[in-house]
């Protein structure tokens, strides 16, 4: 399975593509979409949508994972971040892809094993997990972490679902 991880931002939106082959995680690509500060805000949202649409067309991911909004003391910043997330999610949905969302705590827990891990610890672990030649740009690194989190979570859901005994879906199928 190939996953596009997205770390949305109104100025910089990071993306990372990770593929799972058996138990191996393979780094496909990563990068960032830098919006032009001269554009008005709707123009920046269009840049995010267009950039991610291009990435989706080029790499053909199976699923998309997006980092969830953090709480901010600045309401205006939180609103803009939410709108950038919306542009990213719409790009994925427009391509017919399923979208999962994860908090920063969930991402750190999945990658490092500790929800309170420092950004540097996450980057170091990603470099090792994905055999990266160097640490990725900060936003791209966050996006790679979101993709890895989704692959780990998806694997856990499939594994636990297969371990759950089948339940009767109606009384006719009930067998004591």
UniProtKB/Swiss-Prot annotation:
It comes from the Bacteria. Mg(2+) 1 binds at residues 7, 139. GO terms for molecular function: crossover junction DNA endonuclease activity; DNA binding; magnesium ion binding. The active site is at residues 7, 67, 139. It catalyses: Endonucleolytic cleavage at a junction such as a reciprocal single-stranded crossover between two homologous DNA duplexes (Holliday junction). Homodimer which binds Holliday junction (HJ) DNA. The HJ becomes 2-fold symmetrical on binding to RuvC with unstacked arms; it has a different conformation from HJ DNA in complex with RuvA. In the full resolvosome a probable DNA-RuvA(4)-RuvB(12)-RuvC(2) complex forms which resolves the HJ. The RuvA-RuvB-RuvC complex processes Holliday junction (HJ) DNA during genetic recombination and DNA repair. Endonuclease that resolves HJ intermediates. Cleaves cruciform DNA by making single-stranded nicks across the HJ at symmetrical positions within the homologous arms, yielding a 5'-phosphate and a 3'-hydroxyl group; requires a central core of homology in the junction. The consensus cleavage sequence is 5'-(A/T)TT(C/G)-3'. Cleavage occurs on the 3'-side of the TT dinucleotide at the point of strand exchange. Belongs to the RuvC family. This is Crossover junction endodeoxyribonuclease RuvC. It comes from Pelobacter propionicus (strain DSM 2379 / NBRC 103807 / OttBd1). The gene is ruvC.
